Design a protein with these regions (language model features):
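Hydrophobic core of alpha-helical transmembrane segments in multi-pass integral membrane proteins
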Residues: 22-35, 124-132, 144-154, 223-230
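Divalent metal-coordination and catalytic microenvironments
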Residues: 51-53, 97, 204
Length: 241
């Protein structure tokens, strides 16, 4: 019981804000990781986990039956769910993928701004554990376990300074990383009809009658607004207008 109490106090307590230079350095590092193809290729799988996890979470919340998630080496993925073939539940499930990394980043930024750094890391572990239970292929299981393992090691064993750097880097990465897949979606749709037919935006267009281009624009708007809001929350003290 004493161990549980100590753990709860650690998770629910507040931590001091890191120095401004660390916030700026982690923002620049995250932007470089997202912008560089060589680093994006492995790191982008974290965005795929968030993307497919978004489909899965909303499918369950909307009353659909989740059958599983598969993650692939090329950073693509697919989420299987069953339920009504029409209606808001299916639309929300399809729309959740591209916006989820950005929304998670904005939510995590709010926790960091409230000095709940440890809570943010442990909440990430809970979400990764839930995602792992839905994974249905070996590569997906390895990807989620590797991500969760890194979060656990840092949150449990690393000193506060390292935890802060890791947490801020992760949040900036979600915020910046939520934009790149939308840009890739827009570029891919303009180049390939096969991509267009298979994309979330085009599936949403078939469900709703709203043009796929407008769905892509909506995904982009959410990502940009989340980045703007998250950056405002994370900005070092004295930088706010």
């Amino acid at each position: 019981m004493h161990v549980i109490t100590r753990l709860w106090d650690r998770v629910s307590g507040s931590q001091p804000l890191p120095p401004g230079w660390l916030i700026v350095v982690t923002a620049v590092a995250a932007l470089l990781i997202v912008a560089n193809t060589g680093t994006w290729r492995p790191a982008g799988k974290v965005i795929t986990i968030a993307h497919e996890g978004g489909h899965a979470l909303v499918s369950v919340l909307s009353g659909r039956r989740l059958d599983g998630i598969r993650l692939h080496r090329d950073s693509s993925g697919v989420t299987y769910s069953r339920g009504k073939r029409t209606g808001p539940g299916l639309v929300l499930t399809a729309a959740a993928g591209y916006v989820m990394p950005s929304l998670l980043g904005a939510g995590a930024a709010l926790l960091l701004a409230q000095r709940h750094l440890t809570a943010m890391l442990w909440l990430a572990l809970v979400l990764l554990a839930a995602t792992f239970l839905a994974i249905r292929n070996v590569f997906g299981a390895v990807a989620v376990l590797a991500t969760a393992g890194a979060v656990f090691v840092v949150s449990y064993y690393a000193p506060p300074e390292v935890q802060a750097g890791f947490a801020y880097l992760a949040v900036w990465f979600l915020l910046f990383g939520g934009i790149r897949p939308v840009l890739e979606l827009a570029r891919g749709r303009s180049r390939s009809r096969n991509w267009a037919r298979a994309s979330d935006a085009d599936q949403l267009a078939q469900m709703t009658g709203v043009p796929a281009g407008l769905w892509v624009a909506l995904f982009g708007l959410v990502a940009v607004l989340a980045l703007a809001g998250g950056a405002t929350l994370l900005a070092p003290a004295g930088w706010h207008a």
